[in-house]
Amino acid sequence: MTRRETAAEVFDALGARYEDLFGRVPEQMAALAWIAERLPAGARVLDVGSGTGRPTAEALAGAGHAVTGIDVSAAMVETARTLVPGARFEQADVRTYVPREAGGFDAVCSFFPLLVMDQPEIEAALDRMASWVAPGGYLVLATVPGDIRGLDIEWMGHPVTVSSLSVDQHLRRLTEAGLEVLHHHTSTFVPADPLAGPEEHFFCYATRRTA
């Protein structure tokens, strides 16, 4: 039986190649523009699964916000610290991460970091990220949707086991966690690499209303 790789192993191996293929997904760039329009000056932002730091941390730190990026891949964190010196990066897992900042974040961004988990871990990660959103703040997330449970696949040449939630499961979980969903949509992205086929992407924008 082929040993399945962890997310850290996959992204340590992929490095900047991941950014080359997925670093400028049009809907992700639109999501960043959406959140940037709504943040106050010097906002506190958490980038979950920050990768190389591009485009999320780079764009928001460049706009003057205080950005913290977390990623399970040591190689990605090292690269991000070099490419985006205006943000802070930590090697950390969303399942166990404890923010240093009291009072939460003005924005939590989560672009595709939850797939190499099981469904209960994804649900717990959504709950945790929602809890880090300060009143008046936002959560912007993207993933590959579907009621997927422990599916063994080959992705970018790496054997991994993936899970996900359907669109409705995501929306219900975020609402139960106290967020208001403002917008969501799905789209199809085709990376320019034969090892990465077309992907359905789910984007969701949510907020925690002030009392």
Tell me the role of every PLM-derived stretch:
Residues 1-41, 147:
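Conserved class I S-adenosyl-L-methionine
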Residues 136-143:
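Conserved beta-strand signature within the Rossmann-like core of class I S-adenosyl-L-methionine
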Residues 144-161:
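Short, glycine-/aromatic-enriched active-site segment of Class I SAM-dependent methyltransferases
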Residues 107-120:
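A short SAM/SAH-binding and catalytic strip from SAM-dependent methyltransferases
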Residues 123-135:
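A short glycine-rich, Lys/Arg-flanked "PGG" loop and its adjoining helix->strand segment in the class I
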